[in-house]
A protein has these predicted regions:
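An N-terminal assembly and electron-transfer interface module characteristic of large anaerobic redox
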Residues: 1-110
Length: 110
């Protein structure tokens, strides 16, 4: 049971894309490399002086703005990512890597 506090710490980190560890790394001068898919080669994400951050949109309650720019038939993940980007949730990113795996994601990243 005493190990549960460690699980709660990691669970809390997942509540926001720009969490405590991301903020600390950016403040230390590291460059945040955003990526959307696990097909991105790991060697590109582990460059010296950089750290990787998977594009996520936890607690995204509405995709109204994203639906204005994309059809409502687009995957909810893509609309949530676009919604979070419009809200400024990825302003900490220094670069963005996109994989050719999803047509909707490719359109959003263009």
């Amino acid at each position: 049971m005493k190990d549960l506090k460690h699980l709660i710490f990691f669970e809390n980190l997942l509540q926001d894309a720009q969490n405590e560890l991301v903020t600390q790394a950016v403040n230390d001068g590291k460059i945040a490399l955003g990526y959307n898919c696990y097909y991105i080669p790991e060697v590109l994400l582990n460059l010296p002086g950089c750290f990787s951050s998977r594009l996520r949109a936890p607690r995204c309650e509405s995709t109204d703005i994203a639906t204005y720019y994309m059809t409502s038939r687009t995957c909810p993940y893509v609309r949530s990512i676009l919604e979070r980007a419009v809200e400024g949730g990825y302003n900490y990113l220094g670069a963005l890597f996109g994989a050719e795996c999803c047509a909707a994601m490719e359109r959003m990243e263009a």
